[in-house]
């Protein structure tokens, strides 16, 4: 069986390396106190997935698209805005899927907002469409990156229709789900592995990931909690 690597780079940024390609999700690297690498680390990418326009998710995506030639994959409105600043883009929307050279991507809903902050104009906000999550199929495995979201009941449909090898869920609370909601989400999604994200980058989202792992073990032991420090990987 082909092995896939899911490497955490801090906050909500993940690099997924499969047999047919390498993708990066929500590349908030420069200015991220939790990141283990900067954008200069990446010389080849096959896709850059961005869940929404907030600066802690869009991050260095435009620069990386320009440098590597990889398409920035996101909702239509955000794609149009990023293209103005030189990014190569592939626009999609909620519920749609597309097959790329590295695998298949389907956009899911996420309960969150989205604005675009033009490079160098951080006080200027433009509405950037809906926030989203990603269902990614690579090497025959389904991975779910929820983006920034609150808990929603249709996570059960995601889990029912896609046998998830792994899911990345926010646990930071305040802006997204907290620990208890993420554990309940696990009961709906039923992933083999659950990787917490979007916590401890800023004071307002401080959480104890070990506490989350213990809560998951008590409430839903069918999913294995995988706490990754920036730079660490899960091989599946």
From Swiss-Prot:
It comes from the Bacteria. Gene3D superfamilies: Ribonuclease Z/Hydroxyacylglutathione hydrolase-like. One of its GO terms (molecular function) is hydrolase activity. InterPro entries: Metallo-B-lactamas, RibonucZ/Hydroxyglut_hydro, UPF0173, UPF0173_UPF0282_UlaG_hydrolase. Keywords: Hydrolase. Belongs to the UPF0173 family. NCBIfam families: PRK00685.1. This is UPF0173 metal-dependent hydrolase DSY1309. It comes from Desulfitobacterium hafniense (strain Y51).
